[in-house]
């Protein structure tokens, strides 16, 4: 967008959010079609020019956070209020994840922050405002070449670099190599090794959690075949994190994909903090499996999912 349009977007946003004018009134004031005014206001929001702050705590969510932390041994837990979304609660989780990332970036405690994959993390980066950062690098925690652009981590890393002004690195290799031998060849390349090691050493890893079924994003994005995920399900696989699979008891599973996966370790031996951003009733079993693995430092989820995770039927 040209500078003139940037200025116009800010003016439209100011009239709408500060002056309290309707979008049609903004359009009339600026001499624009209503559709144009709407797009300018939306652009200002997407660019992080509009920041909303709500003071105060939601008692019910805090109670859920404490109960989840106690039940699963979490050091950090955040529950976003239910806003009535159907299916995957992308708006609630996206805003909660965006606020978490903004706080972590502003605190300046990290040299490297690792970013996983998935629609929820993409939404969080999308909702995150522009943030001032210093001496910070972002790195993708998994191979970034996919056949489906919508699932491509490159876009997420580009946006987070744009919003922080800090460098963001992706691994220029597939998430899953064709063979274990191919994986070794790819990881032996100097540029790939550097980014892979950076991801493994990231002090903070923000990840998504996936299911092990036909609706899993790994399947719908074309990263793996349906038959492969069915094979993992037959082994007892329930949840997935960074291409690592877990059964209902939280035990890590060695699968046919294990030797082909190009992603950072999820072991906590390096003392990194792994924080998962995940929710939705369809993912409850997957999230519970990963929680039981003991590998998570923290969880950011939504209210209905939190209730289901502590045993309240249907998240009610």
Swiss-Prot record:
Keywords: DNA-binding, Repressor, Transcription, Transcription regulation. Disruption phenotype: Mutant shows increased transcription from the ery promoter. GO terms for molecular function: carbohydrate binding; DNA binding. The gene is eryD. Belongs to the SorC transcriptional regulatory family. Residues 23-42 bind DNA. Induction: Induced by erythritol and negatively autoregulated. The keyword Iron does not apply. This is Erythritol catabolism regulatory protein EryD. Erythritol may act as an inducer, probably by binding to EryD and inhibiting its repressor activity. The keyword Secreted does not apply. Represses the expression of the eryABCD operon, which is involved in erythritol catabolism.
């Amino acid at each position: 967008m040209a500078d003139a349009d940037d200025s116009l977007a800010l003016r439209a946003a100011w009239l709408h959010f500060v002056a309290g004018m309707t979008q049609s009134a903004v359009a009339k004031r600026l001499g624009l079609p209503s559709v144009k005014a709407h797009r300018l206001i939306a652009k200002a929001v997407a660019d992080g020019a509009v920041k909303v702050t709500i003071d105060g705590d939601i008692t019910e969510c805090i109670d859920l956070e404490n109960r989840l932390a106690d039940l699963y041994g979490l050091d950090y837990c955040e529950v976003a209020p239910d806003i009535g979304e159907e299916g995957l609660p992308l708006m609630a989780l996206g805003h909660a994840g965006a606020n978490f990332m903004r706080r972590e970036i502003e605190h300046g405690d990290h040299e490297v922050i690792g970013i996983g994959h998935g629609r929820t993390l993409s939404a969080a980066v999308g909702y995150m405002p522009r943030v001032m950062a210093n001496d910070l690098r972002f790195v993708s925690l998994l191979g970034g070449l996919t056949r489906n652009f919508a699932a491509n981590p490159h876009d997420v890393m580009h946006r987070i670099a744009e919003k922080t002004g800090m460098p963001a690195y992706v691994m220029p290799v597939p998430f899953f190599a064709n063979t274990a031998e191919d994986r070794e060849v790819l990881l032996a390349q100097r540029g790939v090794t550097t980014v892979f090691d950076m991801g493994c050493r990231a002090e903070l890893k923000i990840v998504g959690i996936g299911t092990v079924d036909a609706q899993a994003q790994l399947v719908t994005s074309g990263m793996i075949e349906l038959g492969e995920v069915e094979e993992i399900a037959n082994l007892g696989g329930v949840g997935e994190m960074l291409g690592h699979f877990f059964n209902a008891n939280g035990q890590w599973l060695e699968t046919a994909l294990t030797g082909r996966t190009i992603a950072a370790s999820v072991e906590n031996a390096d003392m990194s903090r792994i924080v998962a951003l995940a929710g939705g009733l369809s993912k409850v079993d997957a999230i519970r499996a990963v929680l039981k693995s003991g590998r998570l430092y923290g969880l950011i989820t939504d209210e209905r999912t939190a209730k289901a995770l502590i045993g309240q039927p249907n998240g009610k």
